[in-house]
């Protein structure tokens, strides 16, 4: 339903476009984060830190985050992003993500940590897209 909500948002704002990101274009590296692989391949720039995406996101007033898994991939992506963008720029939709089974404690601690750093954490039903 996240894809449909993003598309509906686009339709209501003809001059704006939601930006969906794919990761792991290199099958020989592990990508937890969307921004970089765990061990970058020196011969493959797609495995290095994605500063194009970071700089693009820096221009946004609000960055709405959803995805899987909060304990691993999404969490690492957010950690990478908040090294360059203030956590207060982000809204984490807590009901649009979940941890890997058995890692619920890590996801809970992550949400608490990011909340203390200024990230808004809320359910998708609490988000008013008109404010974004």
Over which residues does each language-model region extend?
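Active-site-adjacent betaalpha module
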Residues: 1-132
């Amino acid at each position: 339903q996240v894809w449909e909500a993003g598309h509906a948002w686009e339709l209501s704002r003809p001059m704006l476009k939601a930006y969906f990101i794919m990761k792991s274009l290199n099958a020989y590296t592990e990508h937890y984060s969307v921004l970089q692989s765990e061990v970058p391949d020196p011969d493959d720039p797609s495995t290095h830190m994605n500063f194009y995406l970071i700089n693009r996101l820096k221009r946004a007033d609000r960055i709405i985050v959803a995805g899987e898994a909060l304990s691993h991939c999404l969490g690492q992506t957010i950690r990478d992003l908040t090294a360059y963008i203030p956590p207060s720029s982000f809204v984490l939709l807590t009901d649009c993500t979940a941890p890997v089974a058995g890692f619920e404690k890590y996801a809970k601690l992550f949400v608490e940590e990011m909340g203390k750093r200024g990230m808004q954490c809320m359910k998708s039903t609490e988000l008013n897209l008109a404010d974004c």
